[in-house]
């Protein structure tokens, strides 16, 4: 960092340093099919901070549709920000446009939905973009975890299909490390102008040292090499988990619902236990895992007998032990 000298001590541009914004724009062009003006990129310390900026920018009078099932924290962030949320119901192709009702903002993870792993096909994406354009609505594209597809190239981002109605969000916390609290969003040009007028007084929340380091990591190709290594590592980890399940004495009671996206998969289990009993017994055995039914907010789905298997944080030596306990628990 000696190369930057006194620059590290200067006040930060409110949107983040130009070097990092340019590096992110280049990365998005190469890997997500997006043509992005670095001036439309905003850097922040974590997506929670950026979501709160969006609430202020779009207005608290808006109704936000959130995927059902979905990541519960998103709904809590919006509620804490004072906005009304409704459920965006899904079928096998993703969010149903007809379920959006009076919503004016849709929060969606089309390239890797959590917890189902669903990848929204182009036809459904175009339907949702039509909903946004015709109603002058907004789509917040949460692209978290999209780097980790193992057997196919990632589908281009929705933002690449319509840069005027889509707000793109992503973070480096999963692809690098949770302690690296660097996230960013790409705003449509006219929305960025409004941001500068309305919220441009906010200071950038990421230290200059971290920004310059990440900018160099991206621009010199180290991030791409890192992602390729991690894809290989996690693919081997996934294959190990799948192999243990398939060789288990209870293998005939397991169905792996594979979507080739992200760092988890759904495991359907044949059992007489309720979801609550099943996850409770697993926790007693030292296996902390959630059922798919826990991710429903409205019209809660009971006893789907699907477990959300997140294998990214499990130590290799624990995998065989955990898989060996499953037949006894069931």
What residue spans do the PLM features occupy?
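Conserved core of the PLP fold type I
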Residues: 3-136, 140, 146-148, 153-161, ...
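Active-site PLP attachment segment
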Residues: 160-194
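Active-site C-terminal subdomain of aminotransferase-like
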Residues: 192-210
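Conserved glycine-rich beta-strand-loop-beta hairpin in the small C-terminal domain of fold type I
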Residues: 232-242, 254-268, 278-280
């Amino acid at each position: 960092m000696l190369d930057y000298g006194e620059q590290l001590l200067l006040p930060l541009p409110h949107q983040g340093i130009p070097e990092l914004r340019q590096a992110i724009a280049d990365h998005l062009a190469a890997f997500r099919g997006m043509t992005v003006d670095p001036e439309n990129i905003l850097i922040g310390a974590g997506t929670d901070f950026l979501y709160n900026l969006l609430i202020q920018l779009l207005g608290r009078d808006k109704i936000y549709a959130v995927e059902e099932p979905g990541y519960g924290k998103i709904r809590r962030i919006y509620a804490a920000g004072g906005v009304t949320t409704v459920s965006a119901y899904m079928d096998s192709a993703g969010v149903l446009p007809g379920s959006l009702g009076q919503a004016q903002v849709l929060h969606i993870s089309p390239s890797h939905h959590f917890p189902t792993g669903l990848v929204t096909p182009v036809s459904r994406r175009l339907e949702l973009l039509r909903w946004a354009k015709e109603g002058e609505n907004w789509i917040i594209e949460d692209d978290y975890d999209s780097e980790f597809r193992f057997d196919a190239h990632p589908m281009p981002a929705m933002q690449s299909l319509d840069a005027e109605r889509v707000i793109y969000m992503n973070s480096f916390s999963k692809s690098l490390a949770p302690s690296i609290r660097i996230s960013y969003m790409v705003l449509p040009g006219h929305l960025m102008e409004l941001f500068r007028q309305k919220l441009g007084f906010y200071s950038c929340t990421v230290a200059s040292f971290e920004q310059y380091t990440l900018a160099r990591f991206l621009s010199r190709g180290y991030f791409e090499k890192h992602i390729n290594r991690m894809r290989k590592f996690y693919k081997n980890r996934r294959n190990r988990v799948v192999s243990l399940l398939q060789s288990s004495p209870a293998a005939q009671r397991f169905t792996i619902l594979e979507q080739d996206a992200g760092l988890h998969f759904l495991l359907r289990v044949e059992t007489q236990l309720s979801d609550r009993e099943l996850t409770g017994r697993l926790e007693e055995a030292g296996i902390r895992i959630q059922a798919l039914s826990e991710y429903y907010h409205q019209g809660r789905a009971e006893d789907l007998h699907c477990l959300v298997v997140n294998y990214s944080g499990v130590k290799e030596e624990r995998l065989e032990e955990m898989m060996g306990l499953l037949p006894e628990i069931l």
